[in-house]
């Protein structure tokens, strides 16, 4: 598909633009998340960034840190911005994987499906990383 065809099909152009913006935002959120995590653990930002750049590393870390609530060796608990940056990064990975499974193998369709899939994944991840852990909920008196 040529770039001149994007001007003829505004829906594809908007979908392509949103997808590019989401991926650029993911890089910014990933950098912020890596910097905050490395500072809280007194570790190298580069090593943390490389770990989080792998999709498996980001999903694993978000699960351990925010869903299981494993405190690890941090100086302070993660703040709300760090939690949302993690949710954004993991939502991009999940939306990409869901798009590969759900949408047809046509690249244009996958680009058009990415923004709505991201919105759903981000909402789900934001709810997961901002809620209280399940262990505390089960200890609450009834």
Language-model-detected regions and their locations in the chain:
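Haloarchaeal acidic low-complexity proteome signature biased toward cell-envelope/secretome components but also
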Residues: 1-15, 39-42, 70-83, 127-142
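Hydrophobic alpha-helical transmembrane segments of multi-pass membrane proteins
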Residues: 14-25, 115
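Hydrophobic alpha-helical membrane-associated segments
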Residues: 22-30, 124
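Alpha-helical transmembrane segments of polytopic integral membrane proteins
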Residues: 27-35, 60, 94
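Alpha-helical membrane-anchoring segments
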Residues: 43-57, 84-97
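Hydrophobic, aromatic-rich membrane-embedded alpha-helical segments
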Residues: 47-70, 107-110
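Membrane-helix boundary connector in multi-pass membrane proteins
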Residues: 97-111
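Alpha-helical transmembrane segments and their membrane-interface exit regions
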Residues: 117-126
